[in-house]
Amino acid sequence: MTETQSALLLRRQLAELNKNPVEGFSAGLIDDTDLYQWEVLIIGPPDTLYEGGVFKAHLTFPKDYPLRPPKMKFVTEIWHPNVDKSGDVCISILHEPGEDKYGYEKPEERWLPIHTVETIMISVISMLADPNGDSPANVDAAKEWREDRHGEFKRKVARCVRKSQETAFD
């Protein structure tokens, strides 16, 4: 049986990330028999509230990748305006190609088949450093980030960072 183009592309990207790791995250398969289910560990970026955290997330790739984007879900609890309460990540690069019916995103900000796991992860790390409060997935976190960044928001993030350190390698 021949490998599909998407499986071949994912295998190449995984091999490249293993050969040339990128600072700030590591990636691997959840199960060695399924190229479409990845687990990533993201290190909280320096000089951010997330610094010191080790956040686990899953990437689920569609069978027609790279024509459509993967879904990303944090497994580790995280308090962030662009991550909903169930852990789903909401950033432009992971949104289906085409027009944004809500008018928040330009077509070029959305998913393009040239994106890779590396570009996705760099975008997620950037999101941790600089949340987008204009298009929140977690309205409560966005409100706290805008109104009480150094108070309640910071306390909730610090709790998530501590918890992530305790459970990082479970």
PLM features per residue range, with description:
Residues 1-170:
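UBC/E2-like fold recognition across ubiquitin and ubiquitin-like conjugation systems
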